[in-house]
Structures are given as C-alpha cells and as structure tokens.
A protein has these predicted regions:
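Pre-Walker A (Motif I) flank of P-loop NTPase domains
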Residues: 54-62
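Conserved nucleotide-sensing/catalytic segment adjacent to the nucleotide-binding pocket
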Residues: 24-35, 90-93, 97-154
Length: 307
C-alpha cells in the first residue's frame, strides 16, 4: 500500500465528519472524496516535507478571496497532519486580530469614515500579530492567549474567552483574505476601481493609508511566513455569491443577528476588499508556493506546487 492510499484510509472518516459538521457535505460526494485524494493529501505531504526540511516551527500563510474556503482548507489540513503525520498544528485567522469596534470608530473620526468597517490592512491590531509570531518562535515556549473576534457583534471577545495556547505547535497556519498582499503604486491608488472608492474616498485618503500599511507593518509581518498557499477564485463576482453563503451560515450559528449583513450590505462590504483581492490574484497566482484553483461551483479544479 502506498503512502497516499494509507493516508486516505486513515483520514477519510474524520474528513467526512468535518464536512458534515461544517454543513458542506454532499450526498453525491464523489468530488469531495477525489479532493481528499488529489488535493488535500498531496498538500499535506508537501507541508510535511517543508516542515522536515526546516526542522523547526513552520509558518504557512493561507489566503484567498472572501468565501473561497480558507477555513475549510485549513481545517482539513489540520486533520490530516494531526492524524497521519502526528503533527501539532495550530490554525489562526487574521480576522481574530481585528481592532476593537471602539478603536475602529476612533479611526473613522481621525483618519477616514471608511475605517468604521473592518477588513482592510490598518484595521488589524498589528502589535498582537507581532506577538503571535514572537510567542510561537520562542525556543523556551510558554503558554499564552490569542485574541478571538466575534463577527456577529463586530467586536473582539473579552480576554477571558481568548484561545489558550498550551503547547508549542510544529506547524502554524495563519489564514486570511489579505495574507501576503503587496502594496500598489501611487498611480494605481489614485484611480478608483468601484463606486465606494469613487464616491466615499474621493481624495484617496483611505486607500492610500491602507497601501502605506501594506508597505510597512504588513510587509514586515508577512516576511515571517515561510510559505504562502493561495486559493485562486475564478473572478471577483464569486466573492459576493460566496460571502452571501457565509453570512447565512453565520446567522444559523449566532444567537445575536444584529451585526449579520443582508444582501445590500454585503454588496457594499465586498467593495472594501475589491482592490486588494484583484491585486492578489495577479501577484500570488505567480509567487505563492502553492496555488489552489477554485471553480465557480466552489469545487477545487486543480493544485499547483512551485517548490
């Protein structure tokens, strides 16, 4: 029996249980089974190879457009790496590092009104992200807490609800829509790409501030990541469709629906992400160590390894 087949037999049950838990299991799940064999298991073997070569904690950045399946992919990788390779894996989302609602309100008053809305570089607590890397890279590991963000209330959880990290992981996956994003030229920043930018950021103060953050703070943070895995969406239109599905899912999970977005709100919300998402499709499709190509029906088309 080869290693791929052995891994498949040992992880199949947990994989299908995870899909059911996430409510993405399909009764006619032939494609999902094929994805385990042809996508997730080979990717897990690649990660194991990178970890073995490195010999110390491996940091992976997983990015892709909103609703592309980053949380699903990272969850599946964690299952395979833990069950088959016996690796200690930690997954964090950059979303958990958003600034508090109050801090973003303050930014909207002192810098630009568009900073009321979370998401773009500049709305994350970069000091907490720095600590994230420092704590995980320590030779003498000490337990610590990582923040948690509640999207249904648009605010950070109180510290007593934060994630307790008690054991040093061998593999760390940081997932998020803008992980690995690069800044644009000033000439591009000046040209609005949607109605939001044209009407609400006429003097390009908001997008210039975001771009400056990418040039400095975020560039330094992303430099700490060993390899990038990029989920390439077919086009930006799919972001709206998939984000709508995410909000419906969030509504079912949440006890408080006051911050969950409707159709019109989502349409406006994704405009905040459009510029960087489109730039990332150009950049990371070429530079990421691994590229996962998605189809319009949310199934994986293929995977490419560059290292």
């Amino acid at each position: 029996m080869n290693n791929i087949q052995d891994c498949f037999l040992k992880t199949r049950k947990n994989y299908l249980q995870f899909l059911k838990k996430e409510k993405i299991f399909k009764k006619s799940n032939r494609h999902q089974i094929q994805s385990l064999k042809n996508i997730y298991i080979p990717l897990s073997f690649w990660i194991e190879k990178q970890y073995t070569k490195r010999g110390k904690t491996l940091f992976l950045g997983l990015s892709g457009g909103q609703g592309s399946g980053k949380t699903t992919v990272s969850g599946i990788l964690k299952i395979i790496l833990k069950i088959f390779f016996k690796r200690e894996v930690h997954v964090s989302s950059i979303d958990d590092f958003y600034k508090t609602h109050q801090d973003r309100q303050q930014m909207s008053k002192t810098i630009h009104p568009l900073f009321k809305t979370r998401g773009v570089p500049g709305t994350h607590e970069t000091q907490l992200l720095k600590k994230f890397f420092i704590f995980f890279k320590r030779k003498n590991f000490k337990k610590f807490k990582l923040p948690k963000f509640d999207k249904s209330t648009d605010d950070r959880f109180k510290k007593r609800y934060w994630n307790n990290i008690k054991k040093k992981p061998e593999i760390v996956i940081l997932e998020g829509w803008c992980i690995g994003a690069k800044p644009q030229s000033n000439a591009l920043i000046k040209k609005p790409i949607n109605i939001l930018e044209k009407q609400e950021d006429e003097n390009f103060i908001w997008r210039k501030y975001v771009n400056e953050k990418l040039k400095r703070e975020y560039k330094n943070l992303f430099a700490k990541i060993d390899h990038f895995i990029f989920i390439k969406i077919p086009n930006f239109k799919m972001v709206f469709k998939w984000r709508l599905l995410q909000e419906k899912k969030l509504k079912k999970k949440s006890h408080s629906n006051k911050k969950i977005m409707n159709y019109k709100e989502i349409k406006r919300f994704i405009m905040f992400y459009q510029r960087i998402t489109l730039q990332m499709i150009k950049d990371l499709s070429k530079s990421a160590s691994v590229v996962i190509f998605m189809k319009k029906n949310h199934e994986i088309k293929k995977i490419i390894f560059r290292t």
